Amino acid sequence: MTTRAQSAALTCTAVLLWGCAPVGTRYLVGDSQVGLPAVPFIGLRYGLAALCFAPLLVWGKVWRWPRADLALVALCALFGVTGYNLPNAIGARTVGAGMVGLLNGVEPLLIALMMALRQRRIPGAGTLVAGLVGLAGIALLALGAGPAMGSARGIALILFGAFAWSLYCVIVPPLLYRRGAVLVSAMTMTLGSLPMLAVGAPGIPHLALQMTTLQWEIMLSMVLGTSVLAILCWNIGSAGLGAEQAGWFLYLLPLVSVAGGAIFLHEPLTLMELSGGGLIMLSVFFSQRWRTT
């Protein structure tokens, strides 16, 4: 049995790893001439991640799961793996790593709102205020971003991914309790990787041949760290904490991404972008403050 402290540590580890993902993705698929094609890249990355989980599927005899659980895990895979990662990879070509992290900072608020809808309770005034503040922050980010730091299309893709991930966080807990975090991680990663592998397959052979040693090293570190280890840590941790409490730790994601983008990619940040990110963080604080009062 995982203690609450262990669950918190695992959840924190997952978010720190995910905070590094936009930096690695932006470095590999950025819109420069040497940037790798985004769709084959994400297909290869998650195809390799699925291979890492394949032995667990055999060990867990997942084909014996009831149809209801198989349908739910397929839905979780669609939202949490495909729906989050494919838009993020494409959006990363025109959105800086720090901007990606700031946009993903809206996820805790989305989780809180979705949980309210699922529990059929009306969000309070505090949640509505938090939502308006968050929307204002997103608007500032969009207005403050230059063409190289955040195109409108790229921002929309990142926000769609944030919505898909938040939905995953809300619908997956019952499955985690019934089937265990390890097997659910294996199933969601494998099933969610298949669509990305399928759409990226035509370009993967050429991509694999053109990648340098450094690019392969970054790719494999992302496969093992931000894809395999992170989803395991998140699912185990969130099973112990619950979706809303685990959402607290998503505060860290924008901080890691912004710092990584500035340090490793030399990404500039305007005052308007920082203000927008601050409003998003403030909206998340309001949503959590309302929840605990």
Language-model regions: role of each:
Residues 1-40, 147-174, 195-198:
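Glycine-/small-residue-enriched transmembrane alpha-helix faces in small-molecule transporters
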Residues 11, 15, 44, 81, ...:
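Helix-helix packing/entry segments at the starts of transmembrane helices
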Residues 17, 21-22, 54-104, 140-142, ...:
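Specific transmembrane alpha-helical segments of multi-pass solute transporters/efflux pumps
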Residues 23-35, 90-93, 142-152, 200-219, ...:
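Membrane-interface helix termini and inter-helical loops of multi-pass transporters
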Residues 28, 41, 45, 91, ...:
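Hydrophobic/aromatic residues within transmembrane alpha-helices
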Residues 33-83, 110-114, 133, 164-171, ...:
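Transmembrane alpha-helices of multi-pass small-molecule transport proteins
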Residues 53, 74, 114, 123-144, ...:
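Hydrophobic transmembrane alpha-helices of multi-pass small-molecule transport proteins
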Residues 67-69, 101-104, 117-140, 151-155, ...:
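Loop-to-transmembrane alpha-helix entry segments
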